[in-house]
């Protein structure tokens, strides 16, 4: 139920601050 960060992480890494990767989408911590 975490809000989506507006970023994908198909390479396994999120570049947006405060976001973590739950492949293939980044979620806010």
Curated annotation (Swiss-Prot):
The record, for InterPro entries, names: Cyclotide, Cyclotide_moebius_CS, Cyclotide_sf
- Sections of the chain in a coiled coil: none
Disulfide bridge map: 5-19, 9-21, 14-26
Is Ribonucleoprotein tagged as a keyword?
Answer: no
Q: Name one GO biological process term.
A: defense response
Per UniProt, which keywords does this protein have? Disulfide bond, Knottin, Plant defense
Instruction: Say where the cross-link Cyclopeptide (Gly-Asn) occurs.
Output: 1-29
Protein modification: This is a cyclic peptide.
* Highest taxon of the lineage: Eukaryota
What does the UniProt function comment say about this protein?
Probably participates in a plant defense mechanism.
Please state what the annotation says regarding this protein's domains.
Answer: The presence of a 'disulfide through disulfide knot' structurally defines this protein as a knottin.
Q: Which family does it belong to?
A: Belongs to the cyclotide family. Moebius subfamily.
Q: What protein am I looking at?
A: Vodo peptide N
Question: Which organism's genome codes for this protein?
Answer: Viola odorata
Q: What is the lineage of its organism?
A: Eukaryota, Viridiplantae, Streptophyta, Embryophyta, Tracheophyta
């Amino acid at each position: 139920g975490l809000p989506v960060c507006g970023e994908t992480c198909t390479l396994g890494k999120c570049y947006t601050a405060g976001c973590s990767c739950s492949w293939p989408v980044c979620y806010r911590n």
